[in-house]
Amino acid sequence: MNNQELAEKLLLMRTSQGQWEKLLIQDKLQKVRKFRHLLVEHRQRIAQALFFDSGKPYEEALGAEILPLAEACKFLEKNAAHLLRPRKIRSSDTPWWMFLQKSKVHRKARGIVGIIGTWNYPLFLNGVQIIQALVAGNGVVWKPSENALETNKILAELILATFPPNIFTELSSSRESGPVLVDSNIDFVVMTGSVETGKAIAKKCAERLIPSTLELSGIDSLLLLEDGDVDLAASAAWFATNINAGQTCMAIRRFVIPETMLEKVTTKLLELAKNFKPRKILMESQADCALPLIDAAMIEGAELKWPLTKSDIWKDGHFDACILINVRKEMGICNEAIFAPVLSVLTYKTIDDAICISNACPFGLCASIFTASQELGEKVALELKVGSVSINDAIVPHAHPATPFGGVGLSGWGATQGEEGLLEMTRPLSISIVSGKFRPHYELATPKAADSIPIVEGLLLALHAPTWFGRIKGWFKLLLSGFQKKQS
């Protein structure tokens, strides 16, 4: 679809989107429910498509794609009506000198949302963003990834079987479609992908002054504290390194542990590695990015513990999960995005050191903390420069349908998922109704403007002076000014 064809499509969508936005939220949510049920009915087709596209096994297709998308739909069914309802401003929050005013804040659809999709979780991540945009009343133009063609086809089919025509359009998955979409007359962009692509899109959006949500890469850390369960933390790190063959934005890349636990942690990781069968990764270019970073780290002093030789890392499209120890936070492998199963082990002496190591990375998507103390875990979590933290688990908690998902730094901005993700698809519209005819501020545009100075000054002192004496003085000045004005 070229620029002209897309422009014509958007003109038609504008009309349909306006009608869709006016539809009762309950009617929109009935369609979400139908879509959720279709996910269940077509689960085997979806799983087969995911396997065809990326080699994702059936259990992972169910647990990491279909189930979390269904849960995200159910969250909207239960909560969207409340979240999108107009919010009345309480009388107690209204300044008393605005006593004649009553205000409401409405949530309006942004209009047409352009979604540039990803390939690593093509059903879950794309599905959540599309459904949230539609529930908020938007039209959606979706540019799917060229690396998940079969899954894209089924997702589009289920959307079109559920929602009205002309509020959802799927573009070609070719790379050329992305710039065409961003240059078109859309109102908001949601993009999941690399830092480089995110920067290019941010620049394009800035030129048109349209907002965006960017969910970019991560180099997530797992912090094992002194009182944490070593076996559980090591198992979590291994799981979070290898899920989806390491092709997960919130995969654990840095395992930050007390230096006294290095031997115990390494032993556990090697035990897990020896019984693990590596999976084929989808994009060989990801191996091309990871291997030089591994080489550079080893030259700078890191030690490869698994696999036993460097030549065993990448064979026949299979990337064996790497375990590197003696890694330091300034190494490239801790600062450049990797989309392959590589786990770097870093050691620390104090908790402050651990926090410093985690925050040294320019990416800030997610993090995990393992500790026996919930209080300590939350205290450390609040110091981490990331968008989400899980305590005593990894990856899975971030898929909770009621929580926002998004990063800071080079991991992007904005949020998808949960309340924040839904509201991100809207803009606030405040409406204030003023009764009566008392409008003293109109005098500011008349020759009597200076007469209001004592009244406004008295009001300011009466309400905001730092001392009781000052506030009493303000009330006196206000009453005196009002009396003098009445006499005149």
Which stretches of residues belong to each language-model region?
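Structural signal for hydrophobic packing residues in well-ordered secondary-structure cores
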Residues: 17, 21, 36-39, 43, ...
